[in-house]
Curated annotation (Swiss-Prot):
PANTHER family: COPPER HOMEOSTASIS PROTEIN CUTC, COPPER HOMEOSTASIS PROTEIN CUTC HOMOLOG. Keywords: Cytoplasm. NCBIfam families: PRK11572.1. GO terms for molecular function: copper ion binding. HAMAP family: CutC. Belongs to the CutC family. The keyword Cytoplasm applies. Coiled coil: none annotated. It is found in: Cytoplasm. It comes from the Bacteria. One of its GO terms (cellular component) is cytoplasm. This is PF03932 family protein CutC. The gene is cutC. Pfam families: CutC.
Length: 252
C-alpha cells in the first residue's frame, strides 16, 4: 500500500497528523517559504511526543538551493543536531550554480547523516537534468526523491514521475506538490509508492485585536492573522483512500 507523508509546520500539526493516520512526517517551519529548518524547541517537542518516523527538513533559507559556504556550514550543524537527537531521517537538497546536484557537498551530508534515511527534496525539480540527477542520487545512496516531476504540481508532472519510478534502481520516487484526495488515484495507478501532502489549510488566528497599519513582514499586504495547520479529517480521508485504491505493479 502506498505511504502517506504529511508535511507539518509545527509540533501541534505533527501530533494531529499522527493521530489522523499519517505514515511519516516531514517537519518544517515557515510554510510561506516552502519549508525551512524547524527550531530546536520544535524538534524536541516532536521527538518527545510523536512516535511516527519524523524527518526534519534541513533548509536554512527560502529561495534557490545554491548555498554559500557559511550557509552550508549551518546545514552541516543542523544535520548533526537532528542526527544526535535520534531522528531516523532528514530532508535536504543542494544544487550548484549550473543546476546540477552538488555532489561534493551531498557526499559530506551523506557521510554526516550516517545511517539516517535521506530524502532529496524538490531541489530535484529545479535541476537541469533529472535523469542525470537520479543516477547521481542513486550512487550517493539517497533513500528517496521528493518531486513534482519538474512541474508546478505533481499531477502536471505525472508523466516524468512515472518514468523516474520505472527507471529508479534505488531511491523511491515520492510525488509531492498539490497532492490531494481528489487526485490520489492518478498517482497510485501510475505505480507511485509514496505520496507527500501538506494536507492542511490556513485558519484564522485567535487574535481578536488586530492592529491596523503595522506589519511584521516586508510584505505589508501579507495576512499575518492566519495560521497554517494540518487538517486531520483530510489526512484520515487520504489515508483511507490509499487503503482501498488498487495499486499498480512496479515494473521489474
Amino acid at each position: 500500500m502506498p505511504k502517506l507523508e504529511v508535511c507539518c509546520y509545527s509540533a501541534e500539526c505533527a501530533i494531529e497528523a499522527e493521530q489522523a493516520g499519517a505514515d511519516r512526517i516531514e517537519l518544517c517551519c515557515a510554510p510561506k517559504e516552502g519549508g525551512l529548518t524547524p527550531s530546536f524547541g520544535t524538534l524536541r517537542a516532536v521527538r518527545d511526543r510523536v512516535a511516527l518516523p519524523v524527518h526534519p527538513i534541513i533548509r536554512p533559507r527560502g529561495g534557490d538551493f545554491c548555498y554559500s559556504a557559511a550557509e552550508f556550514e549551518v546545514m552541516l550543524n543542523d544535520v548533526a543536531q537532528v542526527r544526535d537527537m535520534g531522528f531516523p531521517g532528514l530532508v535536504i537538497g543542494l544544487l550548484d550554480a549550473d543546476g546540477h546536484v552538488s555532489l561534493a557537498r551531498m557526499r559530506r551530508i551523506m557521510h554526516l547523516a550516517g545511517t539516517m534515511d535521506v530524502t532529496f527534496h524538490r531541489a530535484f525539480d529545479m535541476c537541469l537534468n533529472p535523469y542525470q540527477a537520479l543516477r547521481q542520487l542513486t550512487d550517493l545512496g539517497v533513500a528517496r526523491i521528493l518531486s513534482s516531476g519538474q512541474q508546478q504540481s505533481a499531477e502536471a508532472g505525472l508523466a516524468l514521475l512515472r518514468e523516474l519510478t520505472e527507471l529508479s534502481r534505488g531511491p523511491i520516487i515520492m510525488a509531492g506538490a498539490c497532492v490531494r484526495l481528489t487526485n490520489l488515484h492518478k498517482f497510485v495507478q501510475s505505480g507511485i509508492q509514496e505520496l507527500h501532502s501538506s494536507a492542511g489549510q490556513f485558519f484564522p488566528s485567535g487574535m481578536r485585536y488586530r492592529k491596523a497599519g503595522v506589519s511584521m513582514s516586508a510584505d505589508s499586504e501579507a495576512d499575518e492573522f492566519s495560521r497554517y495547520r494540518v487538517d486531520s479529517e483530510m489526512v484520515a480521508n487520504m489515508k483511507h483512500a490509499l487503503t482501498v485504491l488498487p495499486v499498480a505493479t512496479r515494473p521489474a
